[in-house]
């Protein structure tokens, strides 16, 4: 069962109105800013409500709601068949549209990458920007840790598989095109935080990374300088994300076990309201209406 959503983190909401019950919300990095900004929309009804936000991945969010340790979650994808089978009473509510941005340093003249070119960068088949119409410089990709929803999403769109290599600070990702026998020799360094990946690219003229479009837009609005590339010749505009002409487009969802009730229901309703959808836009996502 689906309805409209936004980005993901851990939100602990304590409402004295509900007899002190602690309401735990697990949400992604993309959705957390929306939840924070939507709080004033329900404060008059729940003046004693307080929020504590901690980050989590989509998988962790789903597991928390399914397992009863969180009353509200947020995901950047639909539920998988095994997740539905394990918890058939989970309900997704779509609240926003978002995308995945392909990002390079502002000094890089490259403006577009095709599906094959992104695959070639991640697998190490192409290692120099001059092979892609850019300057003579070794491409320095920055990947994301496995728990980040953008990894699975991007893999599915461009048709690659990954394998974790190394541990701790030495951890990275090996990539291969689906159907290929062997993984590429390039170990793509990874980070768990979107803004860390972005910071690396901002500092490195040869950098390349991918992250939620909403995060990239917010960073630009705050003054960060970098370039968001077109993908297969299509710009990541609101219209192109909504129409899915920009292939790296996705929906954001809130997740509950059964129909939302009480404070959670009002929070979901507030985010879906015209005022809430304005908040969605202010936080870099694309409103549903």
Q: Where are each of the predicted segments found?
A:
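Hydrophobic alpha-helical transmembrane segments of integral membrane proteins
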Residues: 3-4, 29
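Bacterial N-terminal signal peptides
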Residues: 4-15
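Exported/periplasmic ABC-transporter solute-binding proteins
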Residues: 19-98, 103-289
């Amino acid at each position: 069962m689906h309805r409209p959503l936004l980005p993901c983190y851990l939100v602990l909401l304590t409402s004295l109105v509900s007899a002190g019950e602690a309401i735990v919300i697990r949400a992604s990095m993309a959705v957390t800013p929306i939840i924070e900004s939507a709080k004033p929309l329900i404060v008059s009804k729940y003046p004693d409500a307080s929020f504590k936000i901690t980050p989590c991945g989509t998988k962790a969010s789903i597991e928390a709601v399914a397992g009863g340790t969180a009353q509200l979650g947020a995901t950047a994808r639909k539920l998988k068949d095994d997740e539905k089978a394990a918890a058939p009473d989970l309900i997704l509510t779509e609240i926003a549209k978002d995308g995945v941005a392909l990002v390079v340093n502002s000094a890089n003249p490259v403006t577009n990458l095709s599906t094959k070119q992104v695959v070639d960068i991640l697998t190490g088949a192409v290692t120099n920007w001059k092979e892609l119409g850019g300057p003579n410089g070794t491409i320095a990709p920055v990947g994301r840790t496995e728990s980040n929803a953008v990894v699975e999403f991007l893999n599915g769109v461009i048709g690659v598989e990954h394998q974790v290599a190394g541990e701790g600070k030495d951890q990275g990702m090996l990539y291969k095109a689906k159907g290929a026998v062997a993984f590429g020799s390039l170990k793509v360094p990874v980070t768990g935080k979107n803004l860390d990946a972005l910071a690396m690219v901002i500092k490195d003229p040869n950098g390349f990374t991918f992250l939620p479009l909403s995060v990239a837009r917010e960073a630009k609005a705050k003054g960060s300088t970098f370039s968001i590339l077109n993908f297969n010749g299509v710009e990541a505009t609101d219209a192109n994300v909504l129409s899915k002409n920009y292939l790296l487009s996705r929906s954001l969802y809130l997740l509950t076990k059964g129909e939302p009730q009480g404070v959670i229901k009002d929070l979901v309703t507030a985010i879906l309201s015209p005022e809430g959808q304005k908040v969605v836009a202010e936080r870099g996502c694309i409103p549903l209406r």
